[in-house]
């Protein structure tokens, strides 16, 4: 159980998962979202996991930012309903999918994006690093290198998708795209500043900082029967 320092917390179920195929995680998110649309009283959720190598595009993404032929089928590519341009997921990148009812917090998408950034910035502070925001962009940077990408979808004020923090990934996959459509700002990973860092150790701090920023009490849980990976 992880509590924020604030009283009167909302409960939030924490699903700490390992390596999960992207489409399984996406289907799981949709299931959790739909349940909460039909029953808004259900507890919020934070999923933490990693993905096998996969490229995802937001619903309005420009395929010009992809440097390979999607039709060749050489790489796993999926277009989904989040905002933002193309991004890359792989082992060593910690992905967070909050399923939150923003009516419990603030019905403001800009506020929500800044809160997700704040979670990452606080995690970096734990390691003595100063995360930065860049005006007009969403995400978190370290010394000019983007270490966290954020893309969300909200339906009836309930969120899905979320953030991806580059902890210790193989960065070669990013060379095949223009990450997030930003050509003049390189991507980076925490391992460049903290050799030997792992997703396993970062998970705790991400959960802790998430609880603090959103004022929730995290209850570590396991997926129920409705989630059966295909």
UniProtKB/Swiss-Prot annotation:
The record marks 146 as: Lowers pKa of active site Cys. Residues 40-218 form the BPL/LPL catalytic domain. Pathway: Protein modification; protein lipoylation via endogenous pathway; protein N(6)-(lipoyl)lysine from octanoyl-[acyl-carrier-protein]: step 1/2. GO terms for cellular component: cytoplasm. GO terms for molecular function: lipoyl(octanoyl) transferase activity. SUPFAM superfamilies: Class II aaRS and biotin synthetases. Substrate binds at residues 82-89, 149-151, 162-164. One of its GO terms (biological process) is protein modification process. It is found in: Cytoplasm. It comes from the Bacteria. The active site is at 180 (acyl-thioester intermediate). Its EC number is 2.3.1.181. It catalyses: octanoyl-[ACP] + L-lysyl-[protein] = N(6)-octanoyl-L-lysyl-[protein] + holo-[ACP] + H(+). It is an enzyme of class 2 (transferase). Keywords: Acyltransferase, Cytoplasm, Transferase. Its main location: cytoplasm. It holds the Pfam family LplA-B_cat. HAMAP family: LipB. In the reaction, the free carboxyl group of octanoic acid is attached via an amide linkage to the epsilon-amino group of a specific lysine residue of lipoyl domains of lipoate-dependent enzymes. Belongs to the LipB family. NCBIfam families: lipB, PRK14345.1. Catalyzes the transfer of endogenously produced octanoic acid from octanoyl-acyl-carrier-protein onto the lipoyl domains of lipoate-dependent enzymes. Lipoyl-ACP can also act as a substrate although octanoyl-ACP is likely to be the physiological substrate. This is Octanoyltransferase. The lineage of its organism: Bacteria, Bacillati, Cyanobacteriota, Cyanophyceae, Nostocales.
